Amino acid sequence: MAEERRRDDGGDVEVELSLRLRTGDDSTSADPAPATVAAEARRNLTIFYNGRMCAVNVTELQARTIISMASQGNFGKQQQQQIQGRDDHHYHQGESSSGGGVSTAAARHCDVAGSSSSHSGSGSGSATPPRPALVSPRAGLQAAAAAAPTMNQPPAASGLSMKRSLQRFLEKRKTRAAAPLYARR
């Protein structure tokens, strides 16, 4: 995905998003196995949003839809289709029906859709699992970005881990130096 920034006459910055896909080797070899084709149909998409990074596994159609919505800026107006009749395995694998909601893959990947489920108010204690509520694509992307590990940690947390790492390194170095293999003569 490429991002270009242009200035309008009014000084506003427009962001143009585009998706450039390469198919790889264009040689006329034998047809690939169906499993290979299915695996290549889904690719990782890295989303940088609100200072965070989230990598999700999406199809080309879903990636194009995300880019289209990002360039139009109408995240709040569109809603994804409600997911019904899927078992938990498919729910976490990122499977979606033909052209299903874009944010469903991101939400399932980051385990956020389960937290936005709605319970039926029957009160009878039925054993049916709660169904996920409708989530807008923007909410799905925000939740995916929130659940993703951040690359830029706060200075205090990264400073402590760096200090601990350095202490472990120095202790191991001292142990290696004292070992008979490295004994000084």
Curated annotation (Swiss-Prot):
Induction: By abscisic acid (ABA), and drought and salt stresses. Down-regulated by jasmonate and wounding. Residues 137-157 have a biased composition (Low complexity). Residues 77-185 are annotated as: Disordered. GO terms for biological process: regulation of defense response; regulation of jasmonic acid mediated signaling pathway; response to wounding. GO terms for cellular component: nucleus. Ubiquitinated. Targeted for degradation by the SCF(COI1) E3 ubiquitin ligase-proteasome pathway during jasmonate signaling. It is found in: Nucleus. Residues 38-72 form the Tify domain. InterPro entries: CCT_CS, TIFY/JAZ, Tify_dom. A motif (Jas) lies at residues 155-182. It comes from the Eukaryota. A motif (Nuclear localization signal) lies at residues 162-169. Keywords: Jasmonic acid signaling pathway, Nucleus, Transcription, Transcription regulation, Ubl conjugation. Pfam families: Jas_motif, tify. Its main location: nucleus. The jas domain (155-182) is required for interaction with COI1. Belongs to the TIFY/JAZ family. Repressor of jasmonate responses. This is Protein TIFY 5. It comes from Oryza sativa subsp. japonica.
